[in-house]
Amino acid sequence: MEKDLDIKLYNEYLDGEKGAFELLYNKYKDKIQYFVYNIVKDYQKAEDITQDVFVYVMQNKIKEGYTFKYYIYLVAKSRAYNQINMEKRRTEINEEY
């Protein structure tokens, strides 16, 4: 039932109902931020990545067969590990010079 409501809200957002986004954001923001924080171990980065996740999810259609919850966590995980990898590359480059 919850996943049906999330998809309904997401589809309403795509149809122009901005309040639907606010409901989804309020429902998932803290959960996603906590999830990302456990990966990146930095509160400010987790907050920034969480914002990026919501922007990405709301600008790109969810793939057929995915629930909103699955998709947002998938994007969050990807963005968090991308951040870690980017920092790792920067560190490696700085150490070379």
What residue ranges belong to the model's regions?
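Residue-level preference for hydrophobic side chains embedded in well-ordered alpha helices
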Residues: 24, 28, 32, 53, ...
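Arg/Lys-rich amphipathic alpha helix in sigma70-family domain 2
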Residues: 63, 74-95
